Amino acid sequence: MTRSLKKGPFVDHHLVAKVEKAIATKDKKPVKTWSRRSMVLPEFIGLTIAVHNGKQHVPVYVTDQMVGHKLGEFALTRTFKGHPADKKVQKK
């Protein structure tokens, strides 16, 4: 179910403060955040945001096509290693 339009997008206030500070100081270091639930706003375009995936912070460069999506969509949490190979001896 989608979010109601009258509520507006959700962004953690501490993330907005960090982004505004990075824009004001023209800092190129990634903005580190644990807030995967925050929505990407147009102010984030051109910044690198380091999103936590449960193990490490994944750098995500924000483009205009990402606006409206959540930050967690761009930092995958699960790694698929592939199914194990069949270890049975093959007959010739």
Curated annotation (Swiss-Prot):
Keywords: Ribonucleoprotein, Ribosomal protein, RNA-binding, rRNA-binding. Gene3D superfamilies: 30s Ribosomal Protein S19, Chain A. GO terms for cellular component: cytoplasm; small ribosomal subunit. It comes from the Bacteria. Coiled coil: none annotated. InterPro entries: Ribosomal_uS19 (IPR002222), Ribosomal_uS19_bac-type (IPR005732), Ribosomal_uS19_CS (IPR020934), Ribosomal_uS19_SF (IPR023575). GO terms for biological process: ribosomal small subunit assembly; translation. Pfam families: Ribosomal_S19. GO terms for molecular function: rRNA binding; structural constituent of ribosome. Belongs to the universal ribosomal protein uS19 family. Protein S19 forms a complex with S13 that binds strongly to the 16S ribosomal RNA. NCBIfam families: rpsS_bact. This is Small ribosomal subunit protein uS19.
